[in-house]
Amino acid sequence: MPPSLTPTERTYTIALSLTKYVGPRSAIELIEALGSATALFTDAELRARILPRLPQRIAQQLASPTMVEEALRIEERCQREGIRPIFFLSEDYPAPLREIAVPPMVLYVRGEYVAWAERKHVSVVGTRSISDYGRVLTQQVVRELSATCPASTIVSGLAYGVDIQAHEAALNLSLPTVAVLAHGLDTLYPSAHWRIAEQILRDGGAWVSEYPPGVKPYRQAFVARNRIIAGLSAATIVIEAGEHSGSLSTANYALESGREVFACPGRLTDPESIGCHKLIEEQRAHLYLGASSMMKELGWGILDEGAEAHPFSAPLVEKPASSSLTREYPPHPLLAILIEQGMLSVDELSRLSGMDLLTVRSELFDLELDGWVQARAGGCYSLC
């Protein structure tokens, strides 16, 4: 694989990617068969031999100078707006994305180029109709990843709901985050997320898209971009998903690409958890029980048998502040333990209370909503 493409080859590769009725995989196979995109557009003898064998609607486009002219305009616009095209046949193309069934031939990147090989990419996705439980859970998942695997990069789609919560949580914890968009990088959808999107760029993250500048969002593009979210990531975590949530397509793409999928459980009565429960029931996703459990499943670091689930958590004993000592708390086994012990991890609360992890997480969620406890770094909880 060439370390880089010549400027001419870059232009003609973009031109080929613009050709209608030629999908990314077909375009890549065509380049590999002919040796270069440049030859397809400039070698008269090759064109005379190849074009008649292609469908007429494709051959007419390749015979016209229109595609190359448009490619030159796109390159000029990319340079003007700080957008970097990355090509499938270049060594700087993200290796995990190269392995999916239909990788983009050109990936457009805006912002700091994230070192894919040096970080652990995890996609955090879910419903747009996020519940209060989903908000708390998204923040907790990202917080656990930050504490347990500081080399994490959070990948999501900048959509309403779980996506934007995941990006914002990553930014608050100084984790790089990558937004995969369903349109050209000269604009932003939804526009309500401009502030967070710009902070992603300022804080060393990136926007990525398979669409060149000038392409507006359209329905099919949102499903297509989900394969890129999954393809960039070693694992996908589904926070909340209704029965027909678009985030389930991200999980499907991840599974098709041989990646691991983790689904977070919710209450049985919550419609926004039906999709997650089905993934777990059908054994298409691991039950998400925490970042350390996920890391072991991924082989990112096996803990010793006697080690705690959160090796990077804060000290297990932290005396509550004086205001907590004078506050009157309702009777609850978890509150009683926190009053006596101070800040504890979820695993410690489970061990000391005798409750299973799922019950502890559910109870902590209710207590957090009621203002009795607050989540801390490393998956720990303390009294408010």
Residue ranges with predicted function:
Residues 1-91, 370-372, 377-384:
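Short, small/acidic-rich helices and loops at N termini and domain boundaries
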Residues 2-7, 87-384:
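Glycine-biased, small-residue-rich flexible motifs in mid-sequence functional cores and linkers
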